[in-house]
Regions:
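Histidine-centered phosphotransfer motif of kinases
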Residues: 85, 89-97
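Membrane-anchoring alpha-helices and their flanking helix-loop junctions
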Residues: 1-84, 98-174
Length: 174
């Protein structure tokens, strides 16, 4: 983990708040064990199990791809470079995608409404964290906006529901 590019105090505080919230939700998902509220259909449980395994693999490969540039903070590191190959050709945020798959897999396995609510909270938080990080990446790397327009944020699906990366003021093509 390396030093981050200079960020103003407000931006750094928001970055740390996002990391703290992510950590709190993940810990809550892992340690809270409410009584089951429902019994998921077998097919859903099996799909969730496969998604969890795939998510763990996706997360690890994303971390390995970043190497020394890996950081929990949604800010570019000083020695980093824009990664657009490998897993990052399929998804702009493979680590977040892996966390989402693991979180939802865990929540379905717990079969509790509270766990599903935590997975939904993790989804909303990682969406916000990705948007925050993308703004910083667009300011740092001239080619980021073009990369973001052709690469899905999370899921490497063959279709796009809508343009997922709005043009940022001052973020030119590179």
């Amino acid at each position: 983990m390396g030093l981050h590019l200079s960020a103003n105090r407000g931006e750094a505080a928001r970055a740390w708040a996002l990391v703290a919230a992510q950590f709190a939700i993940l810990v809550a998902l892992l340690v809270w064990s409410p009584a089951p509220d429902f019994r998921p259909p077998r097919w859903l449980q099996r799909a969730a199990d496969y998604a969890g395994v795939a998510g763990a693999l996706w997360l690890v490969l994303g971390l390995v791809s970043l190497g020394r540039s890996a950081t929990a903070l949604p800010l570019p590191v000083a020695h980093g470079r824009l990664r657009t190959g490998g897993l990052y050709r399929l998804s702009r945020h493979p680590i977040y995608t892996g966390l989402l798959a693991l979180g939802w897999s865990w929540a379905v396995g717990a079969a509790a409404y509270g766990s599903l609510a935590l997975a939904a909270a993790l989804t909303a938080l990682l969406w916000a964290k990705a948007r925050f990080e993308e703004a910083a990446l667009a300011r740092t790397y001239p080619g980021y906006v073009d990369y973001a327009e052709r690469t899905p944020r999370f899921l490497p699906l063959g279709f796009r529901l809508r343009r997922s990366f709005p043009r940022l003021p001052g973020a030119g093509r590179g």
